[in-house]
Amino acid sequence: MSAQGKRLMVMAGGTGGHVFPGLAVAHHLMAQGWQVRWLGTADRMEADLVPKHGIEIDFIRISGLRGKGIKALIAAPLRIFNAWRQARAIMKAYKPDVVLGMGGYVSGPGGLAAWSLGIPVVLHEQNGIAGLTNKWLAKIATKVMQAFPGAFPNAEVVGNPVRTDVLALPLPQQRLAGREGPVRVLVVGGSQGARILNQTMPQVAAKLGDSVTIWHQSGKGSQQSVEQAYAEAGQPQHKVTEFIDDMAAAYAWADVVVCRSGALTVSEIAAAGLPALFVPFQHKDRQQYWNALPLEKAGAAKIIEQPQLSVDAVANTLAGWSRETLLTMAERARAASIPDATERVANEVSRAARA
């Protein structure tokens, strides 16, 4: 059956880890002739980002329940019901053939609305530990996929859809073989930065001296203070930027990455074929630890959990990796990646729409 005229509604919101993989799948299916709309919330990143990609977006009112107190919990059933009713009205008007839930609060009422209308629900879990919304929706979903093994016991492991410019990078052997001079260390704390990395890495630079050159993404509002920290450590030569717009270029430059281990970051690093030193964000589910673990087990990365993080721990780890070791780790990272994740997710969406 032709994809021409098929309609998809993507449900994803809140963070780049949910939105960017959804956009990758949306563009893949749009290139095949699908119509795509988005279900999101008006006060999160998808509200601005999705329309820039040429995709119309509908909004419902919903937010998270964690840490909101007893009053919010009492009001939650009514809020979820209202959001479900809004999503149901949107879907009755749009009539999607299938909905794709990529996570975020919006997927909960959106998935329930689709199910109540008899529309197939396809889920993708980006993290190594399933989010609360996807745990609930998995019971009614037509198909459940996961990026890393372990989030769901029987779900297919398909990887995370990542940006095409990252997938297009030369293989590690072509990129890294023959490199000389200081080891190029890319420090990434996510779009918000990571205070612990901003505090630690200037001191690491002082310990390692001329053996490294660092490109440090500080996050919003931190560039000046991080530059000052490098200068005070006697290392003013290192590059500090608030954001990195072209992550593919940054990955191509780097020999090794020091970063948090959000799901999309881990998947991009594997797809790029880069060794990594992961410092997982401390979360009660240890979500980022479980995201990073497959690459550590593959011999492509090392995890230092935040309570054990120190200047010496980072400096000694980086100093212990020769260029030969870094190339081996990079090749293992690339071998552990699933470069056709976007196509795999898109194929399951197509299959569910035909069922």
Curated annotation (Swiss-Prot):
Principal subcellular localization: membrane
Keywords: Cell cycle, Cell division, Cell inner membrane, Cell membrane, Cell shape, Cell wall biogenesis/degradation, Glycosyltransferase, Membrane, Peptidoglycan synthesis, Transferase
Binding site for UDP-N-acetyl-alpha-D-glucosamine: 15-17, 127, 163, 191, 244, 263-268, 288
GO MF annotation, one: undecaprenyldiphospho-muramoylpentapeptide beta-N-acetylglucosaminyltransferase activity
KW Ribosomal protein (keyword) present: no
EC number: 2.4.1.227
Localization, UniProt: Cell inner membrane
A GO CC term attached to the entry: plasma membrane
Catalyzed chemical reaction(s): di-trans,octa-cis-undecaprenyl diphospho-N-acetyl-alpha-D-muramoyl-L-alanyl-D-glutamyl-meso-2,6-diaminopimeloyl-D-alanyl-D-alanine + UDP-N-acetyl-alpha-D-glucosamine = di-trans,octa-cis-undecaprenyl diphospho-[N-acetyl-alpha-D-glucosaminyl-(1->4)]-N-acetyl-alpha-D-muramoyl-L-alanyl-D-glutamyl-meso-2,6-diaminopimeloyl-D-alanyl-D-alanine + UDP + H(+)
Listed CDD domains: GT28_MurG
A single BP term in Gene Ontology: carbohydrate metabolic process
UniProt xrefs under InterPro entries: GlcNAc_MurG, Glyco_trans_28_C, GlycoTrans_28_N
A Pfam family recorded for this sequence: Glyco_transf_28
Topology with respect to the bilayer: Peripheral membrane protein
Pathways involved: Cell wall biogenesis; peptidoglycan biosynthesis
Family of this protein: Belongs to the glycosyltransferase 28 family. MurG subfamily.
Database matches in NCBIfam families: murG
PANTHER family reported in the protein's UniProt record: GLYCOSYLTRANSFERASE, UDP-N-ACETYLGLUCOSAMINE--N-ACETYLMURAMYL-(PENTAPEPTIDE) PYROPHOSPHORYL-UNDECAPRENOL N-ACETYLGLUCOSAMINE TRANSFERASE 1
Functional summary from the UniProt entry: Cell wall formation. Catalyzes the transfer of a GlcNAc subunit on undecaprenyl-pyrophosphoryl-MurNAc-pentapeptide (lipid intermediate I) to form undecaprenyl-pyrophosphoryl-MurNAc-(pentapeptide)GlcNAc (lipid intermediate II).
Descriptive protein name: UDP-N-acetylglucosamine--N-acetylmuramyl-(pentapeptide) pyrophosphoryl-undecaprenol N-acetylglucosamine transferase
Designated gene of the protein: murG
